[in-house]
Each structure stands twice: as C-alpha cells, then as structure tokens.
Amino acid sequence: MHIKRTLLAIACATLTLAASAQDFNKHFEDRTLRLDYNFSGTNRTQQISLDELSQSPGWYGRRHNLDSLLIRGNGQLEVKLPDSGKTIYRYSFSTLFQEWQSSEEATKVQKSFENVFLMPFPKQPVDVTITLSDTHNHVSASLTHRVDPKDILIRQIGTTGQTPWKYVHQGGDSKEVIDVAILAEGYTEKDMDTFWEDCKMAKESFLNHEPFKSLQDKFNFIAVFSPSKESGISIPHKNLWVNTVMGSNYDTFYSERYLTTLKLKRVHDLLSGIPYEHIIILANTENYGGGGIYNSYMMSSAHNVKTRPVIVHEFGHSFGGLGDEYFYDDQYETMYPADTEPWEPNLTTLVDFDSKWKDMLPTNAKKSKIAKTIKGIDITEPDGKDLYTKVGVYEGGGYQSKGVYRPVQECRMKINEAPVFCPVCDRAIRRIVKYYTE
C-alpha cells in the first residue's frame, strides 16, 4: 500500500513538472528578453518610458508559476497574449525611484531613474504592461507596449565579451535552481583575489544561515569579476569620489549608510550572457552600509565587522521581499498608511492580518502578556524573553513606531545582532524558494 502511494506521489510530481515545462515551452524560448525603462517624476508625478530591448542566450529565471505572483511589490510587469488577453508571465518589484519619491528632494525637482527587467523571450508578439503603485496600493503609473520577437531592433547581447565568472557554489542546474550573481564593485584587476575570498565569505554567510542552509541545493552563487579603474567606494559626505565600474556611492537620498548604484543598465551589461536571476553587489570598503531593493539588487560593504549580518539582511529585502522591522519616531511617517496592508510578509497594519502570520500565533495557553487589543487582535507586550522566536504582534516596524506591527521582538530584519530570521521571515523565504523552483 505504501509503495503504491509513493509511486502515485512520484507520478503526480512528474506530471506537474511536465506541465510546467510544457507551459513554458508553449509561449517562450530558452532566451532572455531584457527590457530597459526610465521611471521619472516628482513626489506627486510618475512617468514610465521604454528605453531599449535586448536579448541574450538562455533563460535563467523561474519556469514555474509563470502567470502568478507571490508578493505584490510596489510595481508589476505583466505579459499578455494580444488576441486572447491571457496572462503568460508576471513579475513584481520595487524601485529606488519610488523610494526617492518620499524624500524631501522629490518635492523640489524632477528626476529620472534607470530600471531593468528580465523576462523569457516570447515566441509570438505580446503586450507588456509595467505598473507602478503608491503606498495605498493604487496604480500611479502604467505603460503598455507591444513586443514583437521578430523586431530587428531587439539588440543581441551576451554572446561575446562576457565578464569573467565562475561558480562559488553550485546547487544544481540553472533551469532548476535560483542563480545569484555576485558582482565586484570597487575592486581593480589587482584586487580580484580579494574579491574571490569575499565571494566565499558571502556564500558562507548565506549557507550557514537558515533557511538558506537547508535549501542550499536550490541555489547557485556565481562570482562575476567586474574590475574597476580605482579601488574603494565613493563616500560623498567625506568628499571621497572613486572611479568604479558601477558608479555606486554612499549617502543615497542623503542617508550616510545607504549604499546603492543608480546605474542599473551598467549592472545588467556586466551580467550579459551569464546565468543570473538575483544580484548581489559586494563593495570593496570597510565603511558600514548597504541597501536592498526587492527583485532589483542588494549591495553591501565587504570588509566591515558587520558585513556578514548585513549581507543576509539586505538579501532578505532583495530576494525575500521582507520589510525593515526597525522603527523611528519621526521618519517615513507615510510609508505604511493605516488603511493599507503592507505587501511585505513580515509587516502588518492589521488591515488584512489574516494574510500574514495570524496562523502562527501561539495558543491561548502560551500567549504573552497583552498590551492592548486593536480590531479584535491582541497586541503583544514585549517581555525580553525568547526574543527571536516568540511570535506575536509587536508594535513598531517599517520605520514607524506606531501603527505598524512586526512578528517578534528581535529579528535579522530588525537588528544585526539577531542570530536568525524569525519564524515568520523564515517561512516567507522558504515560500519564495518554492515559488521559484517548484
């Protein structure tokens, strides 16, 4: 009896995989279509412009769940068949442009930001729609355009002149696992031995940390040896400017520790023809800092005493779509409006708590002290015990001390000292991995 059940389970799994492959092969080729856009505007306006289309050999993104989304993000890409209107591919993301819109600078000037998205190369003409949403999850900008795979102006890239690369960790075939590229920023040709050691450090930071440790056969980590003309990273508040391959700098949006690059086209140029789906950028500096943007990239200093936890934290943003759980009393006051449920799986405003970690709350017998009750939901009183594992509803998160709630007292998404992701973040990452690979 057990043998029959096992054989039936194997048969069902095989049929599911075959159906996924069939669906992919029906609509797409084993190539990548790269779409370059410019997002521009002010704090109140948004405009989307198509810049360029290009194609490269191989598709290294997901081949499962092509027409569904696990996380909403602040923006979405949707691909439809023109005749039937059938959705054949969806992708969600966040952008630095939308984050910039909440800054004081955005009230004074209009700016433009590069954005690059990848999708499998279609076998027939498709309609591609890019949609941006505001903090209330209302559509704030949208652009739909036709892509004809026979268009002679779709530039061919990635066939020659690839940036040198090699695997740091290979969990499996690129068609079955998640490819993560690790790029060098601020490393000269002479620094590449150091970069290789830094890549191994980054890989170990992930694979020694749950849930990545248990899921290491689901990931490939690839070192990409992208040389800069000068060593180091630009730090504007110290009047230090360095000629680096991706032009990154600290002081993003005038925040000293916020390390990013705005040159996304350059980032993807360096990766042309290389297996990649997610991007890590290691910065050759001891200066503390980093940044992570959901389904865009994450960046971290490589030589700071806190580099290891920062790398894991920022990957939580860029890969897992996790929100920051720390908070202030006077910043980002409108980042998470009280009438809108955040899309990040580890934050809630209680508008739709059922969709978050309500099912993970302890039974009545094991509940902690209740601070207050809002919308029928008990808000947990912090007690300093079981800091990283006791799931509750703790007020303070998403940069706001009031009105936004987090799952535990301390988590990797709140402080560097936390040794683990909390149970809610752990589950969210595992779900993402399953979404990409099954």
Please annotate each region the language model reported.
Residues 1-8:
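Bacterial N-terminal signal peptides that target proteins for export
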Residues 12-20:
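Hydrophobic h-region of N-terminal signal peptides that target proteins for export
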Residues 27-152:
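Beta-strand-enriched, solvent-exposed domains that form extended recognition/catalytic surfaces
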